[in-house]
From Swiss-Prot:
Residues 650-669 have a biased composition (Basic and acidic residues). This is Vacuolar protein sorting/targeting protein 10. It comes from Leptosphaeria maculans (strain JN3 / isolate v23.1.3 / race Av1-4-5-6-7-8) (Blackleg fungus). GO terms for biological process: Golgi to endosome transport; Golgi to vacuole transport; protein targeting to vacuole. The gene is VPS10. It is found in: Golgi apparatus, trans-Golgi network membrane; Prevacuolar compartment membrane. BNR repeats lie at residues 100-110, 367-377, 429-439, 723-734, 1106-1116, 1147-1157.
Length: 1477
């Protein structure tokens, strides 16, 4: 949130001679300073001022309004001065670690210290009613984004040492951090609100709002208007009598604003059809009775719309369109001080042209006298020309731009004409009727200031050097300005006076030329005190008001007449009432239907003046119960509301309800108590691709009527027709009337989608295709014809696109045809495309939210050597769109970018593959594989996953067709040193691997192995078996088969002997659609799979469908035969449908598979290929995709009508089992003793109770709590590098291997070395005590003992750099060691949770939704171009589409929430990553 703060311009000096004042001129004193100055400020209601020297950080104080200055002793190296807004005697001077506070305007200072420097953003939080209660925020640690820091507090004004409030916070503030908030109420005096890290995650999507009344000994998460807590909190601010917080859901830039007037009841702010986006709104200076927000109209233009809330801060209506903004978020908007209802704004006149082509803005100034409800031109006396003034986006002085508390006196620099010109072409204008009429005061631009309640106006030339200061005693009328001549020329930097504008003394900060060259800095003190006598009663107008009726009487503004006692403009006197602000009196007016009312939320204005009406907006829903049955009319609001804060008396017809005909509104559909279905037919032979554009439920959590808009699906048929539905497939319409060859949903922003044609034209929507939001742009070239990925997206900058086009490719077979990459930073808009690199195969943005600190502009590309298509590839990098480039590797086969790692495969001269990994995009280290691992050439890699601070890598051992298998090896925390996890793992010809991680739980994975590898090496057919791990690959076991099948019959083998009789399930290599997963991120602990019980995996024809609800420890057979499945309402519904044969029904379970019910969706059978729902599995709707004879069909099945889902589920984190949920803890099946321990702790998850008749709907944080940490056991460790696991589970040195001296790393530049150990703790484990004594200790290298002690003595700061190894040292990339408080050697890890101590149990990135199967394939075997493409094309019917795997972007939209945790791009490594148009 950006705020208009008074701009404090730099200023400085040491002492210089003063100029004696003449009787007819003000007293002038000049003080010179050696250095440039900053932070020139007054203490309110006094003549005491402070200023700071920039170069040395010294602070100077004046007790006489700048006449004389003295340096404050013992205060130096100051970074910032901050005054209390609520105590005009208090201020804090912030140094690097030592700080000072005063309670007597700087006469005396007390010091206090913090461990680290203050935050540059908001270092101090003042309490509005207790000046001794203060928060101090330390600088945030941003090395591993996102930025988190520590906050201290004091309750005695730092008389005692400040105490730590909270460690990992984004921001904190007092509840009573604004004068108007809880004003006069005797409660919440010690209440503090903080936005902190997530419960078990450092990722910004998990940030929480916490409230505490006892300085965070205890804290609670407030429930928002939906009755639930909300994660993803990004910002917070106090605005008059409101506190506003903003939250951002994952995978979306859209924000939700929540407001409160007491921190107990929170409201979700509603903006009608408009979206609020991150970094795209400014909370303006608001009123005591409403919040005013300026919202950007587009991410790419500095222009907005201004909205004003009702008195509760919940419903916002649009007041001003096309407001002018700048890139810093400042808005040309100012309320005229002390005058109610008067607002000055600048608007963009040529907004259409500016929005479309970015041509220069043409600005107009407008003024409102009714708080922004209506606006009029600024007029100059005696002229017809409009006046336009420079405003907040072009500041030239500190404080307010136009006004001060001096009643009705307003000044500004601008020009007359059609539009606002340059500042230097402007003149100074003045108004003494609050902007109603203006006249030119002085020609040329001037800085200006108000004194003595407007009796004195001072101005100084602002376009260069001058030796004059101008002043007026007659409200700035044109001929009333007099000159003060200086003996030297100055360049004015700042002109200021007391904030209340009651003083006759002014200060000017300026610079002047020095003898011998250069400039010196001066503060000039001006005192007008003795120039005029004090005013008498006859000199005042006792009832001055802003506007007057035609009869000369004051007019009504905001429901009353606001009257001031003001000096007459021509009175020859000074008021001299210093430090007393002018106070108005009020006379109430009767309510007027035109003047005192505006359109209510959900209604749009139509017409002007007396003809103005408020008509229901398109997005407005009917009131509950309206137009049901045969009703012809319904009662509704009038559409009008009294303007918030309006004080008029009486009532009018505007406040009465009206009757509206039902014909004006869409009839409510009849409510059903049954499951419903809608079947839609399409022309075509295949569904080419389909994607869900899911709007995060949090964004609309308390607007259930809009739920239908949340479930948008886009789909493409092989007829090249793109379709779209917003209600999960009940009604479909064509997305665009054009031939579409590909759909690209944005990988990181669910609202964005792109429809590609075979030409340069690209259709796109930034709002999921809603509200006629589909537009088009011209790409720089046609799409490439090399079957490469055409579009790439930036994880953080949603409008940054990479386009992979083809040049000279219009003719088929043209030898000059080649690929070219382009960048747009404005979502493809006109003239925004810049060429990057030609002859490329792939270009990718490298930035990620966590763990990789690189420039947002950094891009990696694979480019053909010497710019020849088909030549060997090289990996190149740039952070300026390839104006300069760096070659990272030559002979590159492929590279993959994942959450924490970038992995690059290169081919050596002998044909072997080498793998290098990096964490930061610049320092690479070659992967060290288990010694003696390869007796043959390294032929192919598949990068499987990197979500648990380690890379899982499949290395192919046998690459022969139909005989492929390999080993899964697992890396250390920097991706360089690997140990064996599981051997003989099945792979197919395309590089896909039978490996899948469970969604929602870390460390659980399933794989299929080839049981007869020796026979397979001799050409025999594979015999496959399934294995499961519950400790992140450290140990694998067969799947426990159920005792009986679904017909209650025993199996033919002994299920107690798992080695000979276990469950085997079909894996990733056999799926038509890789988006189909065993598990769901929101149905925690549940998996479904197709397979059989026996000694090995058999065919699909012999398979049954199985289910587990305890993360794979036990399984049950639920149906004979092969079924496809989906989870709904976070596991509350499980729907299955027969796959591969004609059917007219589905089965569903509402009790985790205990009982299955049949629902018939059609009168005749259709062939179903897939069943899908929204990626988060939170919906009550499903879609079946299939064929009906020669036509394609999509069937919506809607469970929302069932009585089981009428009520919203209740969840209470404080009493988790009291409502509709139980607590469930995952277990390790082989754990000795404490079975509830998994990864060294007992985790508790929310799971809906069986039989609870309610809908969960809005996504909940399933992780409830880490109940406790467990004592370490063997299960918390895996074998270290150079060691292998023996059948008994112990780790021993690989036979015949000579271990290097661990101290050798010291000779290569390292500062520390470790004892060798056969074990390493699994990075996920948080176990404590009984740590295995084999764990190696850390030692200092010779010469670094002192640094070692100093570093390892650090404590308290959440993250610190512990050691950086050169990348050759021990194969390290440069990694960080996170240490626990007791100095015990902890795990070495990087990434999102690396910022927390092990003792914090910061292990969970919930839910784990990394790409589970194949993520990246590298192969050295040449592929015949097109063979894979043909293979994939045959599978398009499943929605997998012709695209090989844009990974999350493709399949996050269909199955499982791959977006949730790891921004794994998951490219296929190898020439399989092709794209065709």
């Amino acid at each position: 949130m950006k705020y208009l703060r008074g701009l404090l311009l730099p200023a400085l000096l040491a002492l210089a001679p003063s100029i004696a004042a003449k009787k007819d001129e003000p007293l002038i004193e000049t003080t010179a300073f050696k250095n440039d100055l900053i932070n020139l400020m007054y203490f309110d209601d006094s003549g005491v001022a402070l200023v700071q020297e920039i170069e040395n950080g010294n602070v100077w104080r004046s007790h006489d309004a700048g006449k004389g200055w003295s340096q404050i002793k013992d205060v130096s190296k100051v970074l910032r001065i901050t005054k209390s807004p609520y105590d005009n005697k208090a201020a804090i001077v912030l140094g690097e670690k030592k700080h000072w506070i005063t309670y007597d305007r700087g006469e005396n200072w007390d010091s206090f210290e913090t461990e680290f420097p203050p935050s540059p953003v908001a270092p101090v939080g003042w309490h509005a009613s207790d000046n001794k209660k203060i928060l101090v925020n330390e600088i945030e640690d941003c090395f591993l984004a996102p930025c988190l820091g520590r906050t201290y507090y004091t309750t005695d004004g730092f008389k005692s040492k400040p105490k730590v409030l909270v460690e990992d916070r984004r921001m904190c503030q007092w509840a009573k951090g604004s004068e108007r908030f809880l004003e006069g109420e005797d409660k919440h005096d010690s209440r503090i609100l903080c936005i902190t890290r997530g419960k078990y995650s450092d990722r910004s999507k998990d940030f929480r709002l916490l409230i505490s009344d006892n300085f965070f000994k205890d804290s609670e998460e407030p429930k928002m208007s939906s009755g639930r807590t909300v994660q993803g909190m990004t910002n917070m601010a106090a605005v008059k009598g409101y506190i506003v917080v903003a939250s951002k859901p994952d995978h979306s830039n859209e924000l939700s604003l929540y407001t409160t007037q007491d921190t107990e009841t929170w409201h979700h702010a509603q903006f009608g059809d408009h979206k609020i986006e991150e970094d795209a709104y400014t909370i303006l200076e608001s009123t005591n009775y409403s919040i005013q927000v300026d919202v950007m109209t587009s991410k790419y233009v500095d222009m907005g719309n201004m909205y004003t809330s009702n008195s509760r801060g919940t419903y916002f209506t649009k007041n001003v369109e096309h407001t002018n903004r700048n890139q810093d978020g400042f808005v040309d908007f100012e309320k005229i001080a002390n005058i109610q209802g008067v607002v000055l704004v600048n608007t963009v006149d040529n907004w259409k042209e500016y929005e479309k082509s970015g041509q220069n803005k043409k600005l107009k100034s407008r003024i409102s006298f009714d708080d922004g409800r209506s606006f009029e031109k600024l007029t100059v006396k005696g002229k017809d020309d409009e006046l336009h003034l420079h405003s907040v986006t072009n500041l030239h002085n500190s404080g307010r731009v136009f006004s001060s508390p001096a009643p009705g006196i307003v000044m500004g620099v601008g020009n007359t004409g059609e539009h606002l010109g340059k500042y230097t072409d402007g003149d100074l204008y003045v108004s003494d009727d609050a902007g109603l009429t203006w006249e030119m005061a002085l020609s040329e631009a001037h800085k200006y200031e108000f004194g003595d309640q407007g009796s004195v106006l001072v101005a100084v030339f602002d376009e260069g050097d001058t030796d004059e200061i101008r002043y007026s005693f007659k409200h700035g009328r044109k001929d009333s300005w007099k000159k003060i001549k200086l003996d030297y020329k100055i360049r004015a930097r700042e002109l200021t006076t007391l904030p209340d504008a009651t003083s006759l003394k002014f200060m000017m900060y300026a610079s002047r030329k020095k003898e011998g060259g250069g400039r010196e800095h001066v503060i000039i003190h001006l005192d007008f005190a003795d120039m005029l006598p004090k005013c008498e009663d006859k000199d005042f107008d006792d009832k001055w008001s802003v506007r007057q009726e035609t009869d000369g009487k004051p007019s009504c503004v905001m429901g009353h007449k606001q009257l001031f006692r003001r000096r007459k403009w021509d009175a020859e006197c000074f008021i001299g009432d210093v430090f007393n602000d002018p106070v108005p009196t009020f006379e109430p007016c009767d309510c007027d239907e035109i003047r005192d009312y505006e359109c209510d939320f959900g209604f749009d204005p139509s017409g002007e003046g007396k003809d103005k009406k408020c008509v229901p907006s398109d997005s407005r829903k009917l009131p509950e119960g309206a137009c049901e049955g045969d009703a012809k009319t319904f009662k509704d609001k009038s559409g009008w509301r009294k303007i918030p804060g309006n004080q008029c008396k009486g009532e009018t017809d505007r406040e009465k309800e009206v009757e509206r005909p039902c014909g004006d509104a869409e009839k409510q559909p009849p409510k059903s108590n049954k499951i419903t279905s809608e079947l839609t037919k399409f022309k075509g032979g295949n569904f080419q691709e389909y994607y869900y554009l899911e709007r995060n439920a949090q964004a609309d959590d308390d607007k259930p009527n809009d739920r239908d808009k949340d479930e948008t699906v886009v789909m493409l048929t092989d007829e090249r027709t793109a379709w779209i539905t917003h209600d999960h497939g009940k009604k479909w319409k064509k997305a665009v009337d054009d031939e579409i060859v590909r759909i690209y949903p944005h990988q990181y922003e669910n609202n964005y989608v792109y429809f590609l044609t075979a030409t340069k034209k690209v259709y796109y929507s930034e709002d999921r295709g809603l509200h006629d939001s589909i537009h088009s742009f011209q790409a720089p070239t046609m799409p490439n014809t090399e079957r490469l990925e055409i579009m790439r997206f930036h994880p953080n900058q949603k409008g940054w696109l990479i386009w992979m086009g083809g040049k000279n490719c219009e003719k088929v077979g043209d030898k000059d045809c080649h690929t070219v990459s382009y960048i747009s930073q404005k979502n493809g808009q006109e003239e925004s495309w810049e060429p990057m690199v030609p002859y490329v195969k792939k270009c990718v943005f490298i930035w990620r939210e966590a763990g990789r600190k690189v420039k947002e502009e950094q891009v990696f590309c694979e480019q053909y050597t010497n710019e020849e298509m088909g030549a060997p590839l090289q990996l190149i990098s740039s952070d300026d769109w390839f104006k300069k480039k760096e070659v990272k590797f030559k002979s590159v086969v492929e590279f993959a970018t994942m959450a924490e790692f970038i992995v690059v495969a290169t081919k050596a001269d002998d044909g072997t593959l080498h793998l290098d990994a990096t964490l930061d995009g610049s320092t690479f280290a070659e992967a060290k594989f288990p010694p003696k691992f390869f007796d043959v050439h390294q032929t192919a890699y598949t990068v499987l996953d990197s979500s648990t601070h380690a890379v899982f890598l499949h290395v192919t051992v046998n690459p022969q067709r139909d005989q492929e298998y390999g080993s899964i090896i697992k890396s250390n925390s920097n991706g360089t040193s690997y140990v064996m996890s599981l051997s003989g793992v099945n792979r197919n010809t395309e590089g896909y691997v039978d490996f899948e991680k469970m969604q929602g739980l870390e460390g659980v994975a399933v794989a299929n192995i080839v049981a007869n590898v020796d026979e397979v090496n001799n050409g025999t057919k594979k015999r496959k078996q399934s294995r499961i791990t519950h400790n992140d690959g450290a140990a694998w076991e067969p799947l426990q088969a159920p005792e009986k099948d679904s017909e209650d019959q025993p199996y033919k083998c002994d299920v107690s002997d798992k080695e000979k009789c276990s469950l085997h399930i079909h894996g990733y290599t056999e799926r038509a659609d890789p988006r189909e997963m065993y598990s769901s991120p929101t149905a925690v602990g549940m998996m479904l799979a197709v397979g059989n019980v026996g000694s090995e995996l058999t065919t699909f024809g012999e398979a049954s469908t199985f289910m587990t609800i305890d993360a794979g420890i036990t399984w049950k057979e639920i149906k004979k035969g092969t079924y496809a499945w989906e989870f709904g309402d976070q596991g509350a519904i499980i729907a299955i449908v027969r796959r591969g044969e004609d059917t007219d029904h589905i089965y569903y379970s509402l009790d985790y598979g205990e009982k299955w019910n049949l629902y018939k969706f059609s009168e005749h059978k259709i062939r179903v290929d897939a069943i899908t729902t929204v990626p988060s599995d939170t919906s009550l709707n499903f879609l079946l995709w299939g064929k009906d004879s020669k036509e394609l069909v999509a069937v919506n099945i809607d469970f929302s009508g069932l009585p089981d889902f009428k009520r919203k589920c209740e969840i209470d984190e404080d009493n988790p089992t009291a409502g509709d949920f139980d607590l469930w803890s995952p277990q390790h099946p082989l754990q000795d003793g404490d079975q509830d321990c998994l990864f060294g702790h007992v985790a508790q998850y929310h799971r809906k109770k069986r039989g609870a008749q309610c809908k969960t709907q809005q996504r909940i944080d399933h992780m409830h709590n880490i109940a406790r940490n467990c004592t370490c056991t063997r299960r918390d460790y895996e074998c270290a590098y150079n060691y292998e696991r023996k059948p008994g589970g112990e780790c021993e040195k690989i036979p015949g291997l000579e271990l290097a001296d661990p101290k050798e790393v010291c000779s290569k530049g390292a500062k520390e070395w470790w004892d060798p150990s056969p074990y390493r703790k699994i990075p996920l484990s948080t176990c404590q005590g009984k740590e295995m004594d084999q764990i190696g200790e850390v030692h200092a290298c010779p010469g670094f003992e002192e640094e070692f002690e100093k570093k390892h003595g650090l404590s308290g700061f959440g993250i610190f750099l512990a050691v950086v190894l050169p990348f050759l040292a021990a194969g390290g990339i440069g990694y960080y060691v996170w240490r626990n408080w007791d100095g015990k050697f902890g795990r070495i890890r990087l990434g999102e949770n690396g910022g927390s101590f092990d003792s914090d149990a910061a292990w969970v990135k919930w839910p784990v939704a990394a790409v589970s199967g194949l993520v990246a394939v590298v192969t050295a075997i040449p592929l015949v171009m097109g063979s894979l493409w043909n293979f994939l094309a045959s599978r398009m019917g499943g929605g997998y589409g012709g695209r090989t795997y844009t990974s999350r972007s493709s399949f996050a939209r269909g199955r499982g929430d791959y977006a949730v945790v790891d921004p794994d791009e998951g490219e296929l490594l190898g020439e399989e990553s092709d794209e065709e148009v």
